[in-house]
């Protein structure tokens, strides 16, 4: 199977007995759920503005200049991408983990360009590492089952 096809192939949820006895399977499921739910929740919030009411302040002007429309329009696009990324993680965590890691890298760059958000950028770097770990664990899990 080609590398691309293998990365996109859906990976099933580990069997209950595997989850009970294998810490690696537990870590895989924990990361899979977290990196599916969090992007979907934050993506939905770009529209609902329940958690944060001023998302555009996190968008670097350099990025906003590349995206048509206002900063708020850009945040709606970002929200749609985040929702899609969460769904991809749920179905294909090996590819989804890489997708979320790349997205987080872009967020980190934007936060550093805006300035004043280095603490959030550092937190997002930790999330980026977790997304990469999810992708690697998904690769190992796909081989075992």
Identify the role of each PLM range.
Residues 2-145:
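Membrane-interface extramembranous regions
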């Amino acid at each position: 199977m080609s590398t691309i096809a293998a990365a996109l192939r859906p990976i099933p949820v580990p069997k209950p007995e595997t989850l009970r006895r294998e810490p690696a399977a537990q870590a895989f499921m924990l990361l899979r759920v977290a990196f599916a739910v969090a992007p979907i929740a934050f993506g939905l919030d770009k529209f609902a503005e329940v958690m944060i009411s001023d998302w555009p302040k996190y968008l670097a002007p350099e990025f906003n200049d590349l995206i048509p429309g206002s900063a708020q329009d850009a945040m709606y696009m970002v929200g749609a991408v985040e929702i899609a990324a969460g769904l991809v993680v749920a179905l294909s965590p090996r590819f989804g983990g890489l997708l979320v890691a790349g997205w987080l890298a872009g967020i980190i760059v934007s936060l550093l360009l805006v300035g004043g958000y280095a603490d959030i950028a550092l937190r997002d770097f930790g999330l980026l590492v977790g997304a990469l770990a999810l992708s690697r664990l998904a690769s190992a899990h796909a081989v075992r089952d």
